Amino acid sequence: MGDIQSKLVSGLQLWQWRHQAIKTADATDVPPAEVDWLLGEVAGLDRLALRLESFKDWPEIELQLPLEDLEQLWQRRLHERLPVQYIVGVTPWRHFKIAVSSAVLIPRPETESLIDLALAATASSQTTPPLQQGHWADLGTGSGAIALGLAKIFPQAIIHAVDYSSEALAIASLNANNLQLTDRIRFVQGSWWEPLASLKGQFSGMVSNPPYIPTSTLPTLQPEVFHHEPHLALDGGADGLDCIRHLIEISPTYLRPGGVWLIEMMAGQADIVQELLQNQGCYYNIQIHPDLAGIERFALAYKS
């Protein structure tokens, strides 16, 4: 009972906390909208209640944690630049609510386009059996976001989600479980294609958001990213292309003829990636696609 009691606050108390938090957010260059997102998660308040401040008159609101703990986490957001997604433990992505921790990269909105591109790539292909079926790989799955997206658009496919980090795979498995997709996604620990060697030549497609940031660029990233997100998922080596080169080189062995090769990359890498794909000699119909901001962000090709 005491535990529940410590998590109960009056609407007025929470209203006062919210106003103070918004003020401190403004003062420290944190988007004030994060306050309401946080309260939506920990207090179950919807956007309307927050916008109209109708909760101010409620006699009591049960939080997921005591108000003092919430304040401590908010101070970490302000002063340690801890991402709000790690504070609440979830982030929205496509139609999902995805669990995240500091063991995984926070899935970005632009990465959602990989799923749309995969769908379009299979729709325009005349390959038999259809590319929407069979085996698909999400290499470097992290939170499992891409694997979940693929499982949703390809209900007849088996998705193999690979990651080097066992902690990341635990989060990805949790997400698949929460979304009732565990029967369609197989989680495998290992490096890129290695643990899938028994399925060489059988994959309808491979999708990856690999590490693509040059090592020397990492310290220039936002503190939220540099200090809190896993460098294993960010560091792409001297020119940022180590992992992408590997995926270009190795993937033809695993893809079936006509199979899809699709990755996300950094702004400014498109020309080199396109050239690497052409020079490899095992790909055709090589395409570069922009993200929603018009930046050349995705490379798509088919196995010859």
Where are these regions (language model features)?
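Conserved Class I SAM-dependent methyltransferase catalytic core
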Residues: 238-302
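Conserved AdoMet
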Residues: 41-121
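Conserved hydrophobic residues forming the short capping helix/wall of the S-adenosyl-L-methionine
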Residues: 25, 122, 176, 251, ...
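Residue-level signal for inorganic ion chemistry
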Residues: 38, 81, 111, 146, ...
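Mobile active-site "lid"/loop adjacent to the S-adenosyl-L-methionine
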Residues: 212-243
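Short helix-capping segments at alpha-helix termini
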Residues: 29, 155-156, 177-182, 254, ...
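Conserved SAM/SAH cofactor-binding pocket of Class I
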Residues: 113-220
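Non-catalytic accessory regions of SAM-dependent methyltransferases
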Residues: 1-56
